Regions:
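Structural motif
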Residues: 6-8, 112-113, 182-183
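Short, acidic Gly/Pro/Ser/Thr-rich loop/turn segments
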Residues: 15-17, 97-98, 191-192
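A generic hydrophobic-helix recognition signal that picks specific residues
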Residues: 4, 86-87, 181
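C-terminal charged capping/lid subdomain of soluble metabolic enzymes
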Residues: 28, 130-222
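Active-site segments that bind and position negatively charged phosphate/pyrophosphate groups
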Residues: 44-164
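A glycine/threonine-rich phosphate-anchoring loop and its flanking beta-alpha core
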Residues: 1-51
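Solvent-exposed alpha-helices and their adjacent loops that cap or buttress functional pockets
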Residues: 1-3, 56, 81-83, 175-177
Length: 222
């Protein structure tokens, strides 16, 4: 069974045993909770981005502590610690991430998949008129500064009918939530809102935008 623990001990020395890839993978959960809960924390991550990219210990400790604090506050105050309800804001960016992990046969780490999922939902939020383009660009830029790739070829995988397989992640997420689709999108940095539908054409356009962004970044500068 799963239950909220009585306590969690964070031993920062444990980080020394991780590869750079696995250290980085944890950052995205901090970006996620900052985006939906705490604008000031997001701005702190922006200021610390270069230090975090180099795995500077003080910056990492600051990020881990506040990230854990925000997650704990949500679990303690949301009234739904066992997640019986359909609203799960801490799953921001996760509907696509879970499917990407599966499609890649878990070659893509969870954190790497969540970074892509957040990028996808941020662009969708922009296209839905919830946030301006400047905000979207700011978020994507931070994820890239931290060392994340925001596109993987699995986003373009299709089934026998030519349908993008990533889109089945929406239906699987709906089932995971017990029947009603509830997706967290962004209203602004620091505030998430609930949506009960994702318009497929706009999701596809968001995927194309991420693909084009990745192609531009891969081309050598003049």
């Amino acid at each position: 069974t799963f239950a909220p623990p009585f306590a969690v001990i964070n031993d920062f020395q444990l980080l020394a045993s991780l590869s750079p890839r696995d250290k980085r993978a944890g950052y995205v959960e901090a970006v996620k909770v900052a985006l939906i809960r705490d604008r000031a924390f997001f701005e702190t991550i922006e200021r610390d981005a270069e230090a975090l990219r180099e795995f500077e210990p003080v910056a990492m400790q600051r990020l881990i502590f506040r990230c854990a604090e925000l997650h704990l506050n949500h679990i303690a105050t949301s009234g739904d610690p066992f997640e019986f309800g359909s609203a799960r804001p801490l799953d921001f960016g996760h509907w696509a991430a879970h499917k990407l992990e599966q499609l890649s046969e878990y070659r893509i780490r969870h954190g790497e998949a969540v970074a892509i999922g957040i990028a996808l939902d941020v662009i969708y939020s922009q296209r839905a008129g919830l946030i301006p383009e400047a905000t979207s660009a700011r978020i994507l830029s931070l994820l890239e500064k931290l060392g994340f790739e925001l596109f993987s070829n699995e986003l373009l995988h299709v089934d026998a009918q030519g349908r993008l397989m990533i889109l089945t992640g929406l239906e699987e997420f709906r089932e995971h939530l017990g029947g009603e689709l509830t997706i967290t999108l962004l209203a602004e940095v620091g505030r998430g809102i609930e949506a009960h539908e994702m318009r497929v054409p706009e999701v596809v356009e968001a995927i194309r935008e991420l693909h084009q962004r990745a192609l531009r970044r891969s081309q050598p500068s003049a």
